Amino acid sequence: ISADSEATRRDLIDLVGAPPARVTTIHLAANPLFAADRSLAEVDATLTALRLERGFLLAVGTLEPRKNLPTLLRAYDRLRREAGLRMPLVLAGGKGWLYDDVFRTIDALGLAGCVRHLESVSDAQLACLYRAAGALAFPSHYEGFGLPALEALHAGCPVVASNRGSLPEVVGAAGLLLEPDDVDAWAEALWRVLTDDALADRLRHAGPAQAGQFTWARTAAATLSLYHGA
């Protein structure tokens, strides 16, 4: 059995009863398209097409309950009300199951004018969004791997993520890890990343190095080895 993270491996053993000796962790990797070498002209053209400016807060993934977007929305609302944050929050991802709660929360908090939902973006556009964002916020209650976090690291985008599921092993020390439901902690961490240039620069430089530990060549070699040993 192949698991895409140690967290998934533990779940297969603990929840499904898979024999530990039969479960091998083989990590995924980010598409090289997300590397940090997008040209300024390409990034600027993408921002113009999407009517965005640099420095926005970004969340990537399907809109569904496990992504825990209401917590992010409440933290964002707090920053707008208490700290005067004016940059938009961009939600990039399709509508999943029970997505209505996200839009109900947006309406209840009066955020309709400052939260942008981009339901369909190409990988090339997403790569430019990572390059232009002030930070990626990834507050999921659970991820089996968490490709958006790895993509953002690869692109040199500061990452603030949940400390649940696979995210600690994917993000490592290259991002900030938080309890997923602590609105105060999310507001504080996002404010730090968006306003502390030294912290943001440290995370931008740490991201590609962390992402470099996950390559498709390693994934392919480990998968081939697993098949040969079956």
Model-assigned labels for residue ranges:
Residues 1-230:
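Carbohydrate transferase catalytic cores enriched for Leloir-type hexosyltransferases
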